[in-house]
Amino acid sequence: MADFDMVLKCWGPVEADHATHGSLVLTRLFTEHPETLKLFPKFAGIAHGDLAGDAGVSAHGATVLKKLGDLLKARGGHAALLKPLSSSHATKHKIPIINFTLIAEVIGKVMEEKAGLDAAGQTALRNVMAIIITDMEADYKELGFTE
C-alpha cells in the first residue's frame, strides 16, 4: 500500500497530460527496445523520427497511462481491472510478459524526468509493477499464453 501511495504522489503531472507523457513513454520504449515496435503493427509504417509527433502513438500512450493510473489507484485490489487487460494482451495482441517489465522501466524514467519520481519512488514503482506483472502473468497462464 505504501508503494502505491508513493507512486501516486508523483502521478499528478502524468494524469494532467496523459497524451504527452504517453507519447514520451512509447517513443522511448521504441527507441530503447526497437524490437517492441513489432508488437504494434498499427505503428509499422511510421518513420522512427516521426513517432514522437504521431497522434496514434500519443493516443495509445495515453490509454496505457490511464489504465496504469486506474491500477495504481486500486492500491493492489486490481484483479477486476487487470483481468480484461491480461486477456486482451494475451489472446488478441499476443504481448509477451517481459514487455511489461520493459515499459515499466521506461515509465519510471519518464516519471523521474517529468514528474519528480525520486529514487525511493523508482523503487516503489518497480515494486508496484512487479505485483501487477506477476498478477498478469498468472492471468496469462490461466489463459494458456506462456510466451
Swiss-Prot record:
Keywords: Cytoplasm, Heme, Iron, Metal-binding, Muscle protein, Oxidoreductase, Oxygen transport, Transport. Its EC number is 1.7.-.-, 1.11.1.-. It is found in: Cytoplasm, Sarcoplasm. One of its GO terms (cellular component) is extracellular exosome. It comes from the Eukaryota. GO terms for biological process: removal of superoxide radicals. Pfam families: Globin (PF00042). The keyword Metal-binding applies. Nitrite binds at H60. Residues 2-141 form the Globin domain. One of its GO terms (molecular function) is oxygen binding. Belongs to the globin family. Monomeric. Monomeric heme protein which primary function is to store oxygen and facilitate its diffusion within muscle tissues. Reversibly binds oxygen through a pentacoordinated heme iron and enables its timely and efficient release as needed during periods of heightened demand. Depending on the oxidative conditions of tissues and cells, and in addition to its ability to bind oxygen, it also has a nitrite reductase activity whereby it regulates the production of bioactive nitric oxide. This is Myoglobin. It comes from Pagetodes antarcticus. The lineage of its organism: Eukaryota, Metazoa, Chordata, Craniata, Vertebrata.
